[in-house]
């Protein structure tokens, strides 16, 4: 098979590279930002579908769920299964992506809710510790014979190779797509205080996602904002909201503040255009749909 150049070393680009390598392609990943410098490294990364087109998101998310569930058997992957609850301010809140969950994973009605919430859906989903997982993905690329190289591009590569454009927000320039906009997300990492249940507010960017050594508290979703500098006032609000959801977080030691720019678009772009396969615009849903999207990229490459 021919050579493929994947542009972008976030979770989508690396996952596409792994699937292409597994399918027998020769793959080189090039990116301005290496994996731990990408927005993907900031993600709390609890499997939780959203974005459009919904019918594809459900399919992509289910494929990713199944792959992540299998990766839980690998202690080096950074993937674990955790039970958590999506919270609603109104009675009878529901999710449109129920069918993306496998049998037995939920969602089930939750009766023990934080103050201010009228209903909740509890389910068992993958939670991905991104600094560990991005290292695992990079290692898998190299193990399969691929490479990951820092390269600052002003345009997509031209030549005989097939190109996969997984450049995220970089697709404004590289893909000539002004519909891709940044959605600023700020998080606070605090010490792990014995929490193993995740919480997501369905109506706001507030969430509490426990990991092995810390807890990720979010967040914000400010469209069109490019600043990567943490805002102390926003951090205080994040901490206050998190403590309302999970009181054990009150006074937890702060470890780090982080900001990422989600690459949002009215709908994910996953299509082939000549010798370029575009796969970007996932917003904050990149981890959740990553393996399903990568499967479609391979199908387009082989088709």
Where are the regions a protein language model picked out?
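Central beta-strand plus flanking loop segment that forms part of the substrate or channel wall
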Residues: 44-49, 82-88, 171-200, 239-249, ...
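Flavin (FAD/FMN) cofactor-binding and adjacent substrate-gating region
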Residues: 66-144, 265
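Flavin-binding catalytic cores
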Residues: 195, 212-214, 222-261
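Flavin (FAD/FMN) cofactor-binding core of flavoprotein oxidoreductases
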Residues: 82-83, 87-93, 239-302
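A conserved short coil-to-beta-strand element within the FAD-binding core of flavoproteins
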Residues: 146-159
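Short beta-strand to alpha-helix junction loop
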Residues: 55-63, 120-136, 229-234, 289
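N-terminal Rossmann-like FAD-binding beta1-loop-alpha1 element of flavoenzymes
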Residues: 3-28
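Glycine-rich FAD pyrophosphate-binding loop
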Residues: 22-40
């Amino acid at each position: 098979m021919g050579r493929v150049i994947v542009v972008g070393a976030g979770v989508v680009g690396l996952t596409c590279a792994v699937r292409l390598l597994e399918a027998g392609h020769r793959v080189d990943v090039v990116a301005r930002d290496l994996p731990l410098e990408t927005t993907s490294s900031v993600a709390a990364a609890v499997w939780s579908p959203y974005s459009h087109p919904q019918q594809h998101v459900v399919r992509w998310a289910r494929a990713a769920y199944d792959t992540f569930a299998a990766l839980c058997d690998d202690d080096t992957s950074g993937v674990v299964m955790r039970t958590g609850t999506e919270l609603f301010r109104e009675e009878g809140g529901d999710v449109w992506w129920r069918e993306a969950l496998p049998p037995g994973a939920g969602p089930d009605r939750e009766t023990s809710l934080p103050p201010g919430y009228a209903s909740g859906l509890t389910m068992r989903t993958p939670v991905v510790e991104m600094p560990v997982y991005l290292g695992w993905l990079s290692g898998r690329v190299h193990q399969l014979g691929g490479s990951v190289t820092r390269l600052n591009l002003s345009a997509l590569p031209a030549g005989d190779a097939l190109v996969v454009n997984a450049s995220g927000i970089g697709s404004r320039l590289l893909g000539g797509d002004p519909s891709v906009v940044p959605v600023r997300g700020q998080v606070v990492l605090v010490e792990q205080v014995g929490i193993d249940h995740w919480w997501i507010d369905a109506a706001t960017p507030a969430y509490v996602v426990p990991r092995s050594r810390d807890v990720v508290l979010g967040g914000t979703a400010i469209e069109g904002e490019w600043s990567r500098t943490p805002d102390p006032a926003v951090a205080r609000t994040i901490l206050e909201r998190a403590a309302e959801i999970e009181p054990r977080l009150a006074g937890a030691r702060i470890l780090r503040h982080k900001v990422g720019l989600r690459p949002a678009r009215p709908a994910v772009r996953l299509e082939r255009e000549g010798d370029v396969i575009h796969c970007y615009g996932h917003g904050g849903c990149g981890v959740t749909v990553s393996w399903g999207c990568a499967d479609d990229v391979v199908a387009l490459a082989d088709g």
